[in-house]
């Protein structure tokens, strides 16, 4: 991997990603709507609950519990629960944070609808030098887009096409094949990828 993870670290990261929201099992809030300020503060404590549940389990690396604690921390110190910055945040926590936010923005939730795919990527890019580590973000987007070759997508104009090539310099400006022609989104400035079909 470009992020320099050994097989051992990758295995630990996989487990950390699987368990990062374990603390939510101790949260009893299940309302189908926007949380009150008090409810939101309680929801934020899932990071601490997860850490407390994992930190003393024998046989798992300390990074697993740290990821549960830190996956809502941000590079600029505006995250929670500790307001950590930059190098004070564990590397695995930074990677899981990026994937967690992508999943949140691109999924339907009781309190918001999924954002169009292109808006998710644009928002991620805008956060590159503030909330998230730029190296991790670039690697995440690169690997994400590479998995979409051969996938069907719906454009903002309603057309459906299959991605056949990714532009390495502008990830959203892909080359697509529709039933009638090839579309190069570098040339079609007003068209964007709205969603991945089947995702």
Regions found by a protein language model. Give the residues of each.
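Histidine- and acidic-residue-rich, metal-dependent catalytic cores
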Residues: 1-198
């Amino acid at each position: 991997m470009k992020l320099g993870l050994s097989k051992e670290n990758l295995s630990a990261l996989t487990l950390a990603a699987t368990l990062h929201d374990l603390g939510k099992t101790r949260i009893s809030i299940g309302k189908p709507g926007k949380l009150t300020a008090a409810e939101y503060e309680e929801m934020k404590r899932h990071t601490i609950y997860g850490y407390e549940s994992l930190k003393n389990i024998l046989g798992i690396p300390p990074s697993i519990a740290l990821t549960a604690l830190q996956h809502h921390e941000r590079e600029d110190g505006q995250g929670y629960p500790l307001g950590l910055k930059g190098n004070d945040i564990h590397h695995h926590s930074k990677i899981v944070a990026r994937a967690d936010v992508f999943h949140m923005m691109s999924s339907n939730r009781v309190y918001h609808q999924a954002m169009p795919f292109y808006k998710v990527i644009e928002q991620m890019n805008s956060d590159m030098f503030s909330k998230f580590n730029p190296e991790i973000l670039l690697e995440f987007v690169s690997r994400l887009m590479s998995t979409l070759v051969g996938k069907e997508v719906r454009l903002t104009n309603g057309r459906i096409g299959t991605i056949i090539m990714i532009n390495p310099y502008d990830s959203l400006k892909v080359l697509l094949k529709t039933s009638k022609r090839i579309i190069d989104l570098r040339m079609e400035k007003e068209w964007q990828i709205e969603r991945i079909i089947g995702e």
